[in-house]
Curated annotation (Swiss-Prot):
BP term (GO), one: axoneme assembly
InterPro entries documented for this protein: SPACA9 (IPR027818)
Domain of life: Eukaryota
Annotated signal sequence range: none
GO MF annotations in UniProt: calcium-dependent protein binding; microtubule binding
Species for this entry: Homo sapiens (Human)
Localization, UniProt: Cytoplasm; Cytoplasmic vesicle, Secretory vesicle, Acrosome; Cytoplasm, Cytoskeleton, Cilium basal body; Cytoplasm, Cytoskeleton, Flagellum axoneme
Gene: SPACA9
Lineage: Eukaryota, Metazoa, Chordata, Craniata, Vertebrata
Annotated region (Disordered), positions in chain: 164-222
Name of the molecule in the record: Sperm acrosome-associated protein 9
Quaternary state and interactors: Microtubule inner protein component of sperm flagellar doublet microtubules. Interacts with CABP1 and CALR. Interacts with INCA1. Interacts with microtubules.
Site residues (Essential for interaction with INCA1), renumbered to this chain: 117, 119
Length: 222
């Protein structure tokens, strides 16, 4: 749990930097829409932003801010997977996690999303922009962050035995793999030793000098 909380805090810090460049972000999207001759459709998915950056972005400044947005979305997607490893989930936490996974999907339609108070990202847009173009894409990250904070709040109320650190399964697997190699090497030694012992035992049971003829008493027969 501590690991996912720290990961979420790290993403929040990156988002604060991104939020300061919201006007640069929407301007970059506007430039890409012009280059793509796609001025009618709203920005409706993460995949659309990805496509704009790869095919219609001609400015290094625009590319940098678009990449910042996509990187944050990618980290949120990875954090969803980490959440699944913390505990098996309850109906409440599973519902929150499913919402997060849906929102962070590359193809999910986010055009109708609107972040409300205390978020003010939509307020920084003009009415036309907020309604028709960028209201959804600027609302995406803060809405996901809110859901993830709510997930953590519910998860922290669960019994301690239900929770497990995200790093534990990985650490356990690594320690198991690390221990298996020397154990296997050590385990082969007794078998080799036993094999040698069996060979020695069989050899020791053979009569010595078996190639010599049987002993006969002097001048007599057996």
């Amino acid at each position: 749990m501590n690991e996912v909380k720290e990961s979420l805090r790290s993403i929040e810090q990156k988002y604060k930097l991104f939020q300061q460049q919201q006007l640069t972000f929407t301007a970059a999207l506007e430039h890409c829409r012009e280059n793509a001759h796609d001025k009618i459709r709203p920005i409706s998915s993460i995949g659309q932003v990805q496509s704009y950056m790869e095919h219609y972005c001609n400015s290094s400044t625009d590319r940098r801010v678009l990449l910042m947005f996509l990187d944050i979305c990618s980290e949120l997607n990875k954090l969803c997977q980490h959440f699944e490893a913390v505990h098996s989930g309850t109906p409440v936490t599973n519902n929150l996690l499913e919402k997060c996974k849906t929102l962070v999907s590359q193809s999910n339609d986010l055009s109708s999303l609107r972040a409300k108070y205390p978020h003010d990202v939509v307020n920084h847009l003009s009415c036309d922009e907020a309604r028709n173009h960028y209201g959804g894409v600027v609302s995406l990250i803060p809405l996901i962050l809110d859901l993830m904070k709510e997930w953590i709040a519910h998860s922290e109320k669960l019994p301690r035995k239900v929770l497990q650190h995200v790093s534990e399964p990985q650490a356990h697997q690594e320690s198991t793999r690390g221990a298996a190699r020397p154990a296997q090497a050590i385990g082969t030694q007794p078998r080799a030793t036993k094999h040698k012992c069996r060979q020695l035992t069989k050899a020791s049971l053979k009569p010595r000098g078996c190639s010599k003829p049987p002993w006969r008493p002097p001048g007599g027969k057996l």
